[in-house]
Amino acid sequence: MNNLVEIVIPAHNEEYNIPVIYSAINKALAKTNYTFKVLFVDDGSTDGTLHAIQDLSNHNDNVIYISLSRNFGHQNALKAGLDASSADIVIMMDADMQHPPSLIPALLKSHEEGFDVVYTVRKDNEHISFIKKYTANMFYSLMNYLSEIEIEPGSADFRLMNRKTLDALLLMPDQEIFYRGLVKWIGFKQTKIEYEPQARHTGVTKYSTKKMLRFAITGIATFSNKPLYFAAYMGFAFAILSVLYIPYIIYAFYSGTEVHGWASIVATLAFFGGIILMMLGIVGIYLGKLFEQSKNRPQYLVKAAKL
């Protein structure tokens, strides 16, 4: 059995977390039979993250790194690390210490039991705000309803993959990446481990509300075309209702009945205008995804590396 584990950690403005997470990983794996190396991916940080990584690498042979030319986003930074990984066992996790390194031995134990992918599911605790719990559950419920895959609420980008599954994952040509969905989509033998997220060690979250919303839209648009059918069905339903209203208008015209309700007509027109704009927005999102895919630009650019 190959006992080398490669841990891929994307980092954006995590200067003070870099030495902390490395120390925690070192402690977690000290009593195992595995050797490890840590691949940090500096995702265009503007603080001293790259310097902290380089300093760690200069003093530890098992620390390697990639520095991207700008901030390409968490999923693309993960891809950069996965593309460069060479070990038969790869673990991906975040640098903020909310993915506990102490869980790594449990991931490896499940791998030894024959699982190709060991993913983690976050248990809600006091470190997770009510709004985040509610919006996350709403997203996963909607995602599972609309798509052909099922992602458990609380799923995280903290997982172990063997080389077979990682090679399959890297075959995916998606320009906009949603790894939580892609890992489920490729199949293979998978199992989960639950964990309680810790409080962020230092710094602030890099996922703003805007980024989280875009992440959710990417996930749904990547794995489901049901919103397009929803737009078509709604248009068809309103067309039927409009047709059913025509006989009444004809009857009123020939019977001399005055039809009142200008306010309701204006409100109805405004309502339908909103519906039309919403439908155009749904179609526009899918067209935008196709446009991004057709450009075929690289998902990241490397400024410096030590591998």
Explain the meaning of each model-derived region:
Residues 68-70, 74-84, 101-179, 198-217:
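Acceptor/aglycone-binding surface of glycosyltransferases and processive sugar-polymer synthases
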Residues 25, 81, 96, 118, ...:
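Residue-level signature of catalytic and energy-coupling elements of molecular machines
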Residues 1-128:
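Structured catalytic core of nucleotide-sugar glycosyltransferases
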Residues 178-307:
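Hydrophobic helical membrane-anchoring modules
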Residues 38, 52, 62, 68, ...:
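Residue-level recognition of specific faces of alpha-helices
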Residues 58, 83, 109, 113, ...:
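Solvent-exposed polar/charged
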